[in-house]
Amino acid sequence: MSLTRLLIRDFRNIETADLALSPGFNFLVGANGSGKTSVLEAIYTLGHGRAFRSLQIGRVIRHEQEAFVLHGRLQGEERETAIGLTKDKQGDSKVRIDGTDGHKVAELAHLMPMQLITPEGFTLLNGGPKYRRAFLDWGCFHNEPGFFTAWSNLKRLLKQRNAALRQVTRYEQLRPWDKELIPLAEQISTWRAQYSAGIAADMADTCKQFLPEFSLTFSFQRGWEKETEYAEVLERNFERDRQLTYTAHGPHKADLRIRADGAPVEDTLSRGQLKLLMCALRLAQGEFLTRESGRRCLYLIDDFASELDDERRGLLASRLKATQSQVFVSAISAEHVIDMSDENSKMFTVEKGKITD
């Protein structure tokens, strides 16, 4: 699936843009503040319902406008799909697919699997566990049809349980929540464990190519003790949870531990090496999706040249081309991406929110 057409209206500093896109590489070149990252963010928002640089909707809608509008055409092997997203200042969204309203953002996410690589993406490696849980959950969402519903129900039940912890005095009063929570937690943890085991070889192979000087290991931590039933953990920790007023153990505390030569990667790797590792993990995840489902990711890469020398840029470019996926790359100068260009790619120039090809 590739995005063949993109219409942007009143998004960030872009008043209007109508772009015919390449199924291969699409380059967005312009000075800082020109709007090139806004194009990447528009694509991301069309597939996620939210921007990646700000959660405040007022900052995403163009100044003095009431809403942004995004439309796209997705070309699959057999059919074309029209998609659209409108969001106003109150945060109300309207999702349209093939001319009909009432759809969910999760449907857009399923139609447009994408990988985002930005200068801020180091949080996958040096940020808190929530960023690595999101990495695992992206894979589970696209590989397990029941994951999104289970994950949504888990969040709801944890919120209710945490509220109940402020009121109850005996564990028996929590059993109605835990009766629902326990099987969901175990199912989600099983899916995450299966996904991390399934993608382990892809991550190891890609990392070996990108960072051959390090021995990298990946270990999934489910969020409570090994060999212990979650029901036992919840009951045993009731008094502590009640004092904390939140549930201290469970899939909401899971992590994917990443180590280089036995030490945490954030303590061992340089910024350039961390970026290579981040790119390797995103590529491995996209390639695993293709192998498992036949579907390809869109790759969004902001500020391609940052932190990478010529050799590393060339390595990343060659691996991206090998995926045969659609790729969107922003850069300050065309010189940074010209060696990636071929007869199928498109080069866009961005200046003060105006986009030309």
Curated annotation (Swiss-Prot):
Chief location: cytoplasm
Pfam family, one: SMC_N
Keyword hit for Protein transport: no
Recorded superkingdom: Bacteria
Cytoplasm recorded as keyword: yes
Keywords of the record: ATP-binding, Cytoplasm, DNA damage, DNA repair, DNA replication, DNA-binding, Nucleotide-binding, SOS response
Record: residues binding ATP: 30-37
GO cellular component, one term: cytoplasm
InterPro entries to which the protein is assigned, alphabetical: DNA-binding_RecF (IPR001238), DNA-binding_RecF_CS (IPR018078), P-loop_NTPase (IPR027417), RecF/RecN/SMC_N (IPR003395), RecF_2 (IPR042174)
Any one GO MF annotation of this record: ATP binding
GO biological process: DNA replication; DNA synthesis involved in DNA repair; double-strand break repair; SOS response
Compartment(s): Cytoplasm
Gene3D superfamilies: P-loop containing nucleotide triphosphate hydrolases, RecF/RecN/SMC, N-terminal domain
Cross-referenced HAMAP family: RecF
NCBIfam families recorded: recf
PANTHER family to which the protein is assigned, alphabetical: DNA REPLICATION AND REPAIR PROTEIN RECF (PTHR32182:SF0)
Job description of the protein: The RecF protein is involved in DNA metabolism; it is required for DNA replication and normal SOS inducibility. RecF binds preferentially to single-stranded, linear DNA. It also seems to bind ATP.
Similarity comment: family membership: Belongs to the RecF family.
Protein name per the record: DNA replication and repair protein RecF
